[in-house]
């Protein structure tokens, strides 16, 4: 073999090696917000496995919470992905960031059937099938005795510091609940709120208050959303119900605002991950019952999101294989 052939062969080999390296590293290094609640933690872990094993990304999970994560993505361009971003509190700012090309709302419905509002336990409706609306429930405070003042109905709200605490306190005034014989139950913490539901369910007692889906408790106890009637408009919600009490002089009763929950990504992810990564996140929609079922599994097994992600990928192939290419699915199955 002459020197020209040797050089040509070397160049061809080098070319294939370089191309292969580029292909494997095409996705690059990606950071995903590992939010501080179960469903978002689970979703982040699933995204990590799929993007790493299926598409060759180098994924790092970073601790996150709704507003700090959004601020960091907007100002610093990191983390690259917020799998479950509840956008109601920052919808204007998000729309601005999207219009400027800083962020992308890749998936505007990553989980079906989610939302916030008022809920009751199924046993309550079995005994009192007429209590399907907020108006009907508020006429019967006697059925939902306050734990510290049984002469009043107990209305369970969010812990201090949560955005929904403000909304529920304003709803309390809007629906004139005090006049109707109700009193707010101060739950104190997320554990306190969850514990009040579990205690009522296990004792066969009635419970009424705020909660949201997807969550393990909604799935475990089959909780039923209360019909709160019509939505009273954006101005009432944005400029009154969601504000501190001193900024909401005349709240109007309303259904809960539609929950805007997106998968949001930075422009860096769009450029680094390419069409395959973007296509995966666009297709990645969890059916509500499946998500609630996984959250129940996590609770029953005291499992973290990483454990749940493996369980999901092993047992729910009919769901997740629709999100990825055939070649990616094959790689992911092999990795499991």
Model-identified regions with their sequence ranges:
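Ligand-binding pocket segment of bilobal, Venus flytrap-like solute-binding proteins
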Residues: 71-73, 79-86, 156-237
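A bilobed periplasmic-binding-protein/Venus flytrap-type ligand-binding module shared by bacterial periplasmic
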Residues: 115-126, 258-273, 294-297
């Amino acid at each position: 073999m002459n020197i020209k052939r040797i050089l040509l062969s070397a160049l061809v080999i080098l070319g294939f090696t370089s191309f292969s390296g580029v292909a494997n590293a095409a996705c690059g290094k990606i950071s995903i917000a590992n939010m501080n609640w179960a469903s978002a933690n689970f979703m982040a872990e699933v995204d990590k496995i799929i993007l790493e094993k299926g598409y060759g990304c180098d994924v790092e999970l970073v601790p996150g919470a709704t507003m700090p994560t959004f601020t960091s993505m907007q100002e610093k361009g990191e983390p690259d992905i917020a799998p479950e971003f509840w956008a109601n509190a920052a919808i204007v700012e998000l729309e601005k960031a999207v219009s400027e090309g800083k962020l992308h709302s890749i998936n505007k419905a990553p989980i079906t059937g989610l939302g916030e509002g008022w809920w009751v336990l199924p046993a309550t409706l079995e005994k009192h099938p007429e209590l399907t609306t907020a108006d009907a429930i508020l006429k019967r405070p006697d059925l939902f005795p306050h734990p510290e003042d049984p002469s009043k109905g107990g209305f369970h709200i969010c812990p201090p510091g949560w955005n929904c605490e403000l909304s529920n306190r304003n709803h309390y005034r809007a629906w004139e609940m005090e006049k109707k014989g109700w009193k707010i139950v101060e739950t104190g913490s997320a554990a306190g709120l969850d514990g009040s539901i579990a205690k009522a369910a296990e004792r066969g007692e009635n419970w009424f208050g705020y909660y949201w889906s997807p969550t393990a408790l909604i799935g475990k106890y089959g909780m039923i959303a209360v019909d709160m009637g019509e939505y009273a408009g954006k101005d009432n919600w944005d400029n009154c119900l969601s504000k501190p009490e001193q900024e909401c002089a005349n709240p109007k009763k309303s259904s809960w605002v539609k929950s805007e929950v997106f998968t949001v990504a930075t422009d860096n992810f769009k450029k680094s991950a390419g069409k395959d990564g973007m296509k995966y996140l666009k297709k990645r929609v969890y059916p509500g019952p499946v998500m609630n079922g996984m959250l129940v599994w996590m609770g029953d097994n005291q499992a973290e999101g990483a454990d749940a992600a493996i369980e999901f990928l092993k047992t729910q192939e009919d769901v997740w294989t629709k999100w990825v290419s055939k070649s990616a699915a094959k790689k992911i199955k092999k990795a499991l």
